[in-house]
């Protein structure tokens, strides 16, 4: 009987320690800045008024600061403005 009681106390102590460690790790993570809160990591994207098309590997239809964005193998896309120049290289299509 004494050994069963001792085993129960050991299990209860183990559960308490695991709970405290888990609670501490969750609390420590919440104090760090998330990736979305970091400076310079977000930008504003707006749709332009025009659509764009692909003909013989060349995309056309976007004007101004807009770039063409398509989905998959589609030959049609939407023109988007990324606000400040965030992308220095062309966006890969499809």
Swiss-Prot record:
Which Cys residues form disulphide pairs? 48-66, 52-68, 62-79
Q: Which residues are glycosylated?
A: 51
Q: Which UniProt keywords apply?
A: Disulfide bond, Glycoprotein, Secreted, Signal
Q: Which GO terms describe its molecular function?
A: C-X-C chemokine binding
Q: Which residues form the signal peptide?
A: 1-28
Q: Which GO terms describe its cellular component?
A: extracellular region
Its annotated compartments are: Secreted
Keyword presence, Kinase: no
- What's this protein's function? Salivary chemokine-binding protein which binds to host chemokines CXCL1, CXCL2, CXCL3, CXCL5, CXCL6, CXCL12 and CXCL13.
Protein's recorded name: Evasin P1104
Question: Which source organism does the UniProt entry give?
Answer: Ixodes ricinus (Common tick)
Task: Provide the organism lineage as a comma list.
Answer: Eukaryota, Metazoa, Ecdysozoa, Arthropoda, Chelicerata
